[in-house]
Amino acid sequence: MHISILGRQPAISIAELERVYGDVSWFSDISALVQTPAEADYIDIQRLGGTQKAGRVVLQVPGRDWRAASLKIVQHYSQAWARREGKVTLGISAYGFTEGPRDIQKTGLVLKSKLKSSGTSLRLVPNQESILSTATSHHNKLGLADNKVELIVVRGQSGIIIAESTGAQNITALAARDQGRPRRDAFVGMLPPKLAQIMINLAGPLSVDPSSAMTQPRLLDPFVGTGVILQEAALMHYAVYGTDLAEKMVRFTGDNLNWLQEKQKDPINITLHEGDAMTTTWEQPIDAVVAEGYLGQPFSAPPSNSKLVEVRGNTNHILSEFLKNLAPQIKTGTPVVLAVPAWKDTEGHFTHLPLLTKVEELGYSYVQLRNVRPDQLLYFRPDQVVAREILVLVKN
C-alpha cells in the first residue's frame, strides 16, 4: 500500500490517481491511499502531475496523537537502522498535526542519539516547517536511495500512517520543460506541464488499436497550441497527433517536439497539420483525445454580464461544434479529456458552459469516478477569473 500527498487541488489529484491505479481512496483531505498491483509495487511520481510526494506505507498507528507516532518512529528505526553502514540522511514531514517544526525535529534528534549509540551515523534534514517542501525533498534526493529517507507521517480520520518516501515531484525537470522550450506563446495561454500530465492520465491507461499498424497508442490534441500536452504524452511513450487552426501554432509545436526529441535522444512518432477543430477530418487511429479547448478571452477582473453572455456563447458554440465533429470519427469507448472555461464572479461562484449538461446529446458520457464528482474538477489559482473545468468523457 502507498500514500500520495496530493497537490494544490486535491480533488483533481485523486481523480488522476484513480484513473491510473484504480484502487484509490481518501485518507485525509490532502492524501490518498493507493493499492498498487504486486507486479508494479510503486507509484511512478514523475508521470503524475497531481502528486507532490509518494511513499510506501511502513507503519500504522492508532489514534491521532503525534507523540504516539513519534514513539513508534523512534522504536522502529532505532532497531531497523542499528549498526548500519554509511551515513543515513533523514527528513521528517508531518501532515495534519498541530505540532510545530521543533516537535517534529525533536523526534529526529531522539532517533539520531539512539542510533549513535548503536554505531549508525544519521544526518537530519532541518525542519523549517512541520512539512519539508517538495523542493527540499527533491534537492536532498530523499526517497531515491536506501540511505536517503523521508518519513511521511499523515494523520487521517482513521489513525496515523507512517510511510517511507519513494520520491518527490521533480520540480527542476518540470520547470525546464516549461521554460526551456524554444517556442512559447502567452497569448494562447500557458498550460502548465503538471496539468498536461494530469489530463493525459485522466484519459486512463491506453492500449494500441489492434486494427492499426501502430506500435504505440496515439493521442490527439485538436487545439494543439504550443504542444504542451503532446510533449508530456510523448514522454509517456505515446504517439502524438496535433492539429490547430493557426499555422503558427502547428509550427511552434513542431519546433518544441523536435527540441524534446533531441534532448531525450528518443524518437517521437509525430503527426501535425493545420485544421479547424469544428470541421477537420482527422487521420486514424485515435486512441484518446486530450485538449485544452478554446477558453475565450482572458480577464483580469470578472466581466460584465453582457460581456460574459457573449464570451460564454462564443466558446460554447466552438466547443460544442468540435465535440459534434469529433464524435463520428472516434470509436465507442474512446476517452476524451477536455479543459473548458468556467468564469468566477466576485463572490467566488462559477458560471459554466451550457454544453456541460448536453454531453449525452453530443455523443458522450461522463466517466464516473468513485472519489470525486465531475463538478469538482476545476483548476484555477485564487486570483484567476477564468478557470479550467476538466471534462472526463467517453464516447458512447
Predicted features, each with a name:
Residues 1-77, 96-110, 134-150, 155-396:
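Class I S-adenosyl-L-methionine-dependent methyltransferase catalytic core
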Residues 78-83:
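Short boundary motifs at domain starts and secondary-structure transition points
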Residues 86-90, 216-217:
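Nucleotide donor/acceptor-binding cores
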Residues 91-93, 122-126, 161-163:
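A structural signal for short, well-ordered beta-strand segments and their strand-loop junctions
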Residues 94-96, 115, 119, 166:
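Generic hydrophobic/packing signal
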Residues 101, 107-108, 112-132:
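A gly/proline- and charged-residue-enriched helix-loop-helix capping module
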